[in-house]
Amino acid sequence: MQEAPELTSAAEPASEAWRANEEAHRALVEELRGKLAAARLGGGERARARHTARGKLLPRDRVDTLLDPGSPFLELAPLAADGMYDGQAPAAGVIAGIGRVSGRECVIVANDATVKGGTYYPMTVKKHLRAQEVALENRLPCVYLVDSGGAFLPLQDEVFPDREHFGRIFYNQARMSGAGIPQIAAVLGSCTAGGAYVPAMSDEAVIVRNQGTIFLGGPPLVKAATGEVVTAEELGGGEVHSRVSGVTDHLAEDDAHALRIVRTIVSTLPARGSLPWEVVPAVEPKADPAGLYGAVPADSRTPYDVREVIARVVDGSRFAEFKAEFGQTLVTGFARIHGHPVGIVANNGILFSESAQKGAHFIELCDQRGIPLVFLQNISGFMVGRDYEAGGIAKHGAKMVTAVACTRVPKLTMVIGGSFGAGNYSMCGRAYSPRFLWMWPNAKISVMGGEQAASVLATVKRDQLEARGESWPVEDEDAFKAPIRAQYERQGNAYYATARLWDDGVIDPMDTRQVLGLALTACANAPLGEPQFGVFRM
């Protein structure tokens, strides 16, 4: 990309708009940091004190000890379950992410026993499964740091019986091991009931003496079922499983020892294959990423040139734009991020037929050349109206949606503003299986905006009343609309979305480049498949 033109910023740092944008974004980021700090504490001071009193490392200290010194950790869904379960499950009681262990990128899943004993709420299951999905798609070894009491029994109907519930964790382990994706477990505490299958179905397993326990039925269940009285250590401790049952392969003296053993295991894994694309030395953007706060309006309804974002994310701020004069409400082009080649698809307004055709064409190009795609989403949807329907906007939009769905290259999505309606589909929303998807704190996501939804439903009701010869006073209509607006505002919020794992996390806009770079490095572990496009309606 060294020959690509260098983007320059037209934003004015001295302007009132810049100052207002910056102030708004800083307030949003401050809120984000507060939420993240609270989630990182886990189950609270007393729970942490009990945990460490038993000689255990805290869950995040376990992850830090496992990782290569000084290496980054790309955490997944750190605010899962935010505001759910009466605030009793910060981060859904599990830490998940991608980190480097003995030089290899691995997916790490660490139970947080300070949160309800590490039991699995519905969102805990969803987060664990999401981490496994990331491992499968990117062919990353899995390391499970187990310290869990199993399913959260009061919500068993939302945790146990269905396809994407607790049992899917072990199904995934079996399938990934069969596909040559290593599965490694360290039992650092309880490993109860179905959870016992995590180490039992791993390629290699470590257990800590006098601390780790594995059993399908714990001492209370054994006593109730058989009358036998037995301690947890006698039933399923480290000595039993390392010397007698053979469920585990390594016996450690403490957490630190267990994590050293895991690092040794990872160091014995075969080297990964060649990279699927060329990676060159990274170059910092010429435009300062800190300028994202001022250059980008916090309100997604305010128009701006998305090249202001691209300039602050890509290497050297260099961007080889594709079809710059056609379909100008969609910006497409080639760049590099941390040395990785990328094709960027970025909203610059509402989607018309021309911009949808341009997007489909560009995605096909990237697929043909084996270049990962980065989607920068800020979209209110497709243009509507009689002329546009007659012009075939449905079939043109379908071309772009088909291209997004069928491309074989990794797709990374960043929601930097609004994500509404069919625009979400064309710009690789969660339903289109991006390898990763993040949101900025100002992002909004819903089938349409709250005002539009309220107006649509009010129009339907007004038509019904008029058909019966009844009137509808303005004040009654306003009262009807108000709760609809409030519902959409609440449910479209970035934190409502991330709590339910509709994304992989809410991030500081300034971290966009770093997050994308780490994700691209993870994606480079998996080979590209074969092109496989469906029918494009002409």
In which residue ranges do the predicted regions lie?
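Ligand-binding clefts of soluble mixed alpha/beta catalytic domains
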Residues: 1-538
